[in-house]
Amino acid sequence: MAAGADADGRPRAPAQAAVDASFDASRRFGGVERAYGAAGAARIAAAHAVVVGVGGVGSWAAEALARCGIGRLTLVDLDHVAESNVNRQVHALGSTLGASKVQVMAARIADISPATLVDRIDDFVTVDNVASIVPASAGVVIDAIDAPRAKAALIALCVARRLPVVVCGAAGGRLDPLALRRSDVADATGDALLASVRARLRRDHAFPRQRGAPFGVEAVWSPAPAGGARAASPGEAGMPLACAGYGSVVMVTAAMGFAAAADALAALLRPPRGSASPAPPRASSRGTPPPARAASSAAGP
């Protein structure tokens, strides 16, 4: 196997180097240990999470995982930081314009959590490459992309691998972060992106066609945008969230990313089936109780 390649021969940027001796994880992440317990914090520090799409939602999810002391992160995105990203993406600054999103996010994470190993994949997920993009060592995936076909393929792969996945719905046009919901992707309403993904999962990946039948896949989503939300131009109103699509605000994109990160950690820390140990605490979404089954085996829209 060539240097800098994974088991599939796919090139990956190397994880960062050894940690500086002055780094004190117990001091830096003591609050995480008090919240999740010593055993939970140790499991987080040993876990491998994948964030697919490092933009308005994914960048905040990666930030949250790093600030919880995650052991390894794989960041997947081919995009570069643009000025239009500054309103909603944590890595978008005047000093980072034009730089690779995964590169600047990796540098930020190194400053937050030096012990976190970061693998950078400069690529977009497609139907053809998804199997080689998601590493076999992953413990959970956060899907923060907005292309329905690729999103469905990623979800289907995770389900086939019994890999927990948390799916993020559309954030464009939403203004209220407290309107976020958590449910099975089959139960999400008012989200055109997830509706399109559901249709593809049923048509292309043999997901249940019966109305109301759960997919066993968790989604974080928000109802349809307010009537005043506008796309950049007529004819673009169906776009979920892009520079030329609906307007967006960081209060919603960050909240969705944080919720996805919380659910990803809950999936990582959930006891194996048959265990009597209680799951770590987790906040419920406003107006919607947590579903009976969440991202324990896979997730997607």
Indicate where each model-derived feature is located:
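N-terminal charged helix/coil linker that caps or initiates catalytic domains
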Residues: 1-50, 83, 286
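Glycine-rich phosphate/adenylate-binding loop
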Residues: 2-23, 136-140, 145-150, 165, ...
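Hydrophobic/small residue at the entry helix of a nucleotide-binding pocket
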Residues: 57
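Conserved S-adenosyl-L-methionine
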Residues: 67-72
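Glycine-rich phosphate-binding loop and adjoining beta1-alpha1-beta2 segment
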Residues: 75-113
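Short amphipathic alpha-helix with an adjacent loop that forms part of the alpha/beta core around
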Residues: 128-138
